[in-house]
Amino acid sequence: NRPIALGQELKRSMADQQPTFQQAMEITAAWLQQWDNEEISDEVLADRIGEMVASRDGARGFFVVSLAGESVLMDRLPDAVVGQLRGAGAGVVDLSVRNLAMSTAMAVHHRRAGDEAQQAGSERVSSRCIELLRLLEPAEVKERLEQLLAAALDNRGEDVAFLEKWGYDAEQKQAIGDSVYAVAEG
């Protein structure tokens, strides 16, 4: 009986350990490299991602690396990973929407600055966010995108402070609105 109880305690303590943002980025980078090299299966990666995105810092670290990095994971998401991301609920939807807004606005910023490489990187993140949002829970995505759209185009709602925090201007907000509509068009 003791080994079972010990195993349950160990499992519980592992679940209680939430990575910092920095740790989450490092762990995610290692996992994606293993997955890209076919050293771990879609299912193993999905289980790990499910655990990672259970905390806000874990999810933030995961998305920074997976959306902006060189791994092709976000370009061809395995069903098992989609299932874990959908199962993570509103937190993943929220971060995906915020990443969509930020990458879209930064693409405008980099275009203005004439930095084509950075613009392309921001556009890739934006495109990955659009595709991801099309795969997540539709009702949650719709509600969250409507909230962002209200702030970007009508300067109302909860996301006004988020957009103001980053100092986005009218052209950037219009681009964010266009990206929101791009999710719906898919």
What do the predicted segments below correspond to?
Residues L100-K165:
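Conserved binding-pocket/active-site segment within a compact domain
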